[in-house]
């Protein structure tokens, strides 16, 4: 169910390390299901330096406002501007078109603290 080429946080963010070493970050399908229809996303500006587990923004849905946390230390190289006008992309395609930020200068050693797809699925099963 969850792509094997990513790592996952217990806060329900995913990370995809791209061929150039940058990291694409978004929220998982589980997270978007729990949120319901996403109506607004607040993300950091390009150039912002983030530390692992630091709050990087908020996602607002019809149910709640939830904080977003960065799963890796890095610098925001790019923000998915499509989410400004179309936040529903997070619901429609959370693991692809609904990506949130692209990080550069990431600390790849922190990947070991994140979950594989199968570990994340087991984590979700424990949540009930």
Language-model segments: what does each one mean?
Residues 61, 81:
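Short, conserved catalytic or interaction motifs in soluble domains
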Residues 67-71, 104:
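Histidine- and aromatic-rich ligand-binding microenvironments
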Residues 1-55, 93-128:
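Acidic, low-complexity mobile loops and tails
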Residues 21, 62-64, 72:
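Periplasm/extracytoplasmic soluble domains of Gram-negative envelope assemblies
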Residues 36-38, 62-65:
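A short beta-loop-beta micro-motif enriched in histidine and acidic residues
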Residues 86:
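Basic, polyanion-binding surface patches
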């Amino acid at each position: 169910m969850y792509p094997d080429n990513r790592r996952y946080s217990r806060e329900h963010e995913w990370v995809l390390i791209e061929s150039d070493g940058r990291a694409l970050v978004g929220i998982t399908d589980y997270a978007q299901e729990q949120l319901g229809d996403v109506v607004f996303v607040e993300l950091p500006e390009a150039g912002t330096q983030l530390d692992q587990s630091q709050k990087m923004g908020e996602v607002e849905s019809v149910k709640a406002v939830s904080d977003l946390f960065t799963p890796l230390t890095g610098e925001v190289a790019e923000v998915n501007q499509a989410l400004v006008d179309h936040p529903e992309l997070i619901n429609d395609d959370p693991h692809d078109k609904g990506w949130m930020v692209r990080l550069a200068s990431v600390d790849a050693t922190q990947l070991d603290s994140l979950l594989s797809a199968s570990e994340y699925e087991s984590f979700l099963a424990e949540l009930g």
